[in-house]
Curated annotation (Swiss-Prot):
The gene is murG. It is a peripheral membrane protein. The keyword Membrane applies. GO terms for cellular component: plasma membrane. One of its GO terms (biological process) is peptidoglycan biosynthetic process. Pathway: Cell wall biogenesis; peptidoglycan biosynthesis. UDP-N-acetyl-alpha-D-glucosamine binds at T11, G12, G13, N117, R160, S208, Q310. This is UDP-N-acetylglucosamine--N-acetylmuramyl-(pentapeptide) pyrophosphoryl-undecaprenol N-acetylglucosamine transferase. It comes from Rickettsia africae (strain ESF-5). GO terms for molecular function: UDP-N-acetyl-D-glucosamine:N-acetylmuramoyl-L-alanyl-D-glutamyl-meso-2,6-diaminopimelyl-D-alanyl-D-alanine-diphosphoundecaprenol 4-beta-N-acetylglucosaminlytransferase activity; undecaprenyldiphospho-muramoylpentapeptide beta-N-acetylglucosaminyltransferase activity.
Amino acid sequence: MKKIILVAGGTGGHFFPAVALGEELIKRGYEVHFITDLRCKQYIKQDMKVIFHILDLKRSGNIFLFLPRLSIAVLKAIKLLYNMKPSVTVGFGGYPVIAPMFAAIFLRVPIIIHEQNSYLGKVNKFFASFAKKIAISYEKIKNLPEFAKSKIVVTGGVVRENIRELKVIEMSSRGLTTGSKKSLIKALDSVVKPRNDKLFTIFIFGGSQGAKLFSELIPASIQFLMQKQPSLELNIIQQAALDDQVKIKDIYSKLNITYEFAEFFDNMALQYKEADLVISRAGASTIEELTYIGLPAIFIPLPSAADNHQYYNAQLLEDEKTGWCLEQNNISAGKLADKILELISNPKILEDASQNLLKRRKEGHKLLSNLIEEVI
């Protein structure tokens, strides 16, 4: 049985798509090993079928500290890969892939890199010259070296199986035009106030890195929104830290808004199925999932994201009329409230955005697996 190594870490945005790819490759008869770091250890579940290996590389702004750490990590990775003898190594970008990719190059194992964002990251750009193929999610990608263009294959991003099973969530099946929808939200770690099925549902989350900003901005925006339109019936599903939930709960209760809180949503499919609109960061895996199911979003890019890639992701979607980009440095509770009210008041805008999203949907798990099989 041929072995394939996947390398991803740092955030859930890198981790979960790689796991989804691994599960597709296992179905095709490959033995899949996954090298990740300590940050992503928390996401490993017993029912995941790939074989995990933890290889941590701590970041440091001091080159004299980082180089010895990198050297040790590369030696460990060489030993790991030498014993496995993989047919190919696939890297998803970010600093956790550096050591395993160097090891693969040293052992002459073919490498493929996958860029999930619309801006080629520094690590992927560095390894582009060594890669057999470069898989990308967006047809328009920034920061791509001229020499790398011949290696490009547009595969789209890889979406988790439980999200793919949702297929297309038609706008008419949400709260926009029908009141028959039943709540599927049963998160055990949530704070839930019962809702009826006629409410417009907004799902707010900040990804695996969370979003402290949202715990302050969103409640203030909802207050503005209800002042402008007191008759609105809303349901809010929101990722929030435990110590923020009491304060937010008090605000929403006074506004007679139903709500659900969780520190982290383990099964996003349940929340996606409920939502009429999403407010989130603009990480690649979030965008791919929303694209796959045709769920429109207001994106507030994380300003500290490497190479400002979240801004480029969100701006591209706004240009394609598939979402809306509001920059954190320029946003206010009033501006966000105005945008939400505009979308609630004009369902056709949401419907058009949903259809535009579906036009760019790809079966990334299959296309990337096909590419890997071509290289082996």
